[in-house]
């Protein structure tokens, strides 16, 4: 036996994680050394070893024709390195739904690099720049958060074989092929439109497709257009043109869209036949009237305020409006803000319900003035000059579940019991987006139930994953059934697979799952002791979720906060632009 010394592998922490025989007879070894990856290329004929250290953790990695192809973990990029000197030859931005949390299934076959992830099956010709999306798995089995992709193989007949493990730990294998003779589904096509991808939507597509094999389900994402340079207004305007031309989708995820306008114009089908038992009735019926239920939220974010001290409890419990909170908000030891965007994001949802009434198109000028005046007073009192809190960025953090899914979740930046031990704040306001995260952040610093947990004045919540079915569709019944399936997907099993951008409307599901993890044995209160379900029952009013209106208000509010324009100019600009926006909706 002959040994080939490799200096990089002599380190104590070096861990070999991959070994392949390349087509040219060379041996390609991948090793993890600390937080980086080392690639070693060995020529058996000369016993020479070439070591390449890219400076990041790359996996999986492949060698072909003098180049190393490596996926950068924690990012959405693929790097091509010169195998002789490690120089970057090419870098690709991958069409991934989320950064690679673990090695995806990948292989080099037939002069192509192919890989499979939760977005689909993709390939790049070696030495080329053209990326091909061979299967959009946002509508297929690989989209399921419970399926862990492990390997992919392309056979000589053009079949892509993908293996992995499901939620039950059972091995599964799928074959993907393009069949020119395949019959079109007899039940037609059900088209679902959403601004953004989501775990709940993916789970529903897979569940519905398995229950209705006679029908094809297609999901269209507005985010794809945003990635191609369109603005939010452009995306919504294009969708509206399609809807009113009778060429729109069948099912809508209404988040960010003018849902109130759609209801007033009578273009949404009645969802009253969907069984909403065991749900928060105050949430699921927020868009219902005596004639029917026109939109159905499947998640929601409560607008909450909470505090540690008994002193602030008394003051907060008596607050009837935003003005009543102003003195408390202005004191940094009560509510800590370092970015005016974060302040706006925490208070706007509750205020929007008063500024833009659900019942009609128009602006409540008094409510608008109150919101702008109070938030401007906080900006001045706390001397906030930056747009974003340096600790929390734009107010969104990334939570990852055991399934590797990464989803944006809003974390109240004023709650600094956990984030700022050196400069704590007694109170917090915000729109917590996950039952688990709400519990963790409420008890993490003190290990006790807060002195007060209540809705912000107005008892407002933000509807999320609000579903609607267009009554102009020829698939109305199928669309209603799809929404019903979506509600049925809110189970403890799904709740345990990742974080969500809101609370389930199915009451008690997330509480039961979180309670299994935090049962009081660690000395902290149990989730049920927070009594959040009782707080949720107090919520009565949906916030205005129209993304165009929110951006319109924020753009002008930012000018006020930075001193570029005064209050009167800000109010006048918002009123003028809102009138134009509403006129366009007619």
Q: Where do the language-model regions lie?
A:
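Mature extracytoplasmic/periplasmic domains
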Residues: 128-133, 138-153, 167-170, 176-185, ...
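Extracytoplasmic/periplasmic substrate-binding proteins
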Residues: 378-475
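Conserved C-terminal helix/tail region of periplasmic/extracytoplasmic solute-binding proteins
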Residues: 165, 169, 513-586
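Beta->alpha turn/N-cap motifs
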Residues: 31, 73, 195-197, 253-258, ...
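Hinge/lid segment of periplasmic solute-binding proteins
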Residues: 254-304, 314, 450-454
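Beta-propeller fold detector
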Residues: 2-7, 50-54, 89-94, 132-139
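Helix-loop-helix "hinge/cap" segment bordering the ligand-binding cleft or interdomain interface
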Residues: 3, 43, 288-395, 471, ...
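Conserved N-terminal structural module of periplasmic/extracytoplasmic solute-binding proteins
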Residues: 19, 59-66, 70-76, 83-85, ...
């Amino acid at each position: 036996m002959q040994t080939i010394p490799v200096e990089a592998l002599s380190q104590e922490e070096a861990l070999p994680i991959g070994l392949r025989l390349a087509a040219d007879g060379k041996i390609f070894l991948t090793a993890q050394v600390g937080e980086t990856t080392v690639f070693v290329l060995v020529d058996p004929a000369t016993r020479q070893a070439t070591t390449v250290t890219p400076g990041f953790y790359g996996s999986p990695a492949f060698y072909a024709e003098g180049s190393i192809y490596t996926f950068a973990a924690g990012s959405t990029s693929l790097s091509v390195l010169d195998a002789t000197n490690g120089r970057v030859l090419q870098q690709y931005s991958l069409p991934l739904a989320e950064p690679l949390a673990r090695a995806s299934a990948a292989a080099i076959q037939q002069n192509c690099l192919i890989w499979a992830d939760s977005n689909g099956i993709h390939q790049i010709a070696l030495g080329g720049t053209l990326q091909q999306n061979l299967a959009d798995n946002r509508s297929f089995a690989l989209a399921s958060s419970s399926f862990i992709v492990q390997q992919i193989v392309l056979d000589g007949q053009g079949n892509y074989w993908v293996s992995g493990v499901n939620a039950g730990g059972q091995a599964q294998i799928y074959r993907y092929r393009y069949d020119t003779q395949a019959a079109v589904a007899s039940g037609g096509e059900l088209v679902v439109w959403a601004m953004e991808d989501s775990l709940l939507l993916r789970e529903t597509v897979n569940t519905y497709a398995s229950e209705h094999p006679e029908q094809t389900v297609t999901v269209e994402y507005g985010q794809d257009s945003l990635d191609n340079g369109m603005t939010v207004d452009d995306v919504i305007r294009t969708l509206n043109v399609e809807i009113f031309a009778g060429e729109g989708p069948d099912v809508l995820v209404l988040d960010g869209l003018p849902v109130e306008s759609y209801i007033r114009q009578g273009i949404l089908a009645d969802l009253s036949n969907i069984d909403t038992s065991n749900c928060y009735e105050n949430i699921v019926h927020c868009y219902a009237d005596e004639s029917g239920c026109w939109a159905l939220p499947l998640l929601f974010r409560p607008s909450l305020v909470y505090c540690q001290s008994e002193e602030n409890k008394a003051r907060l419990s008596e607050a009837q409006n935003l003005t009543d909170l102003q003195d408390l908000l202005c004191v940094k030891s009560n509510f800590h803000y370092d970015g005016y965007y974060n302040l706006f994001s925490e208070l706007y949802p509750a205020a929007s319900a008063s500024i833009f009434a659900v019942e009609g198109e128009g602006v409540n000028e008094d409510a608008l003035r109150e919101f702008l005046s109070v938030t401007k007073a906080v900006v001045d009192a706390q001397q906030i000059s930056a747009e974003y809190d340096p600790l929390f960025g734009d107010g969104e953090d990334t939570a990852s579940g055991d399934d590797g899914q990464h989803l944006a979740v809003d974390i109240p930046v004023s709650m600094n019991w956990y984030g700022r031990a050196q400069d704590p704040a007694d109170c917090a306001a915000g729109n917590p987006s996950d039952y688990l995260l709400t519990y963790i952040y409420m008890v993490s610093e003190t290990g006790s139930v807060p002195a007060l947990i209540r809705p912000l004045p107005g008892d407002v919540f933000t509807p999320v994953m609000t579903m609607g079915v267009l009554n102009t569709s020829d698939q109305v019944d199928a669309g209603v059934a799809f929404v019903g399936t979506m509600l049925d997907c809110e189970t403890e099993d799904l709740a345990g697979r990742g974080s969500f951008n809101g609370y389930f409307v199915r009451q008690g599901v997330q509480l039961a799952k979180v309670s299994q993890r935090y049962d009081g044995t660690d000395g902290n209160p149990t989730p049920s002791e927070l009594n959040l379900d009782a707080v949720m029952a107090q919520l009565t009013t949906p916030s205005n979720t129209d993304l165009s209106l929110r951006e319109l208000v924020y753009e002008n509010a930012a000018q006020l906060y930075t001193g570029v324009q005064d209050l009167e100019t800000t109010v006048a600009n918002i009123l003028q632009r809102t009138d134009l926006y509403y006129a366009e909706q007619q």
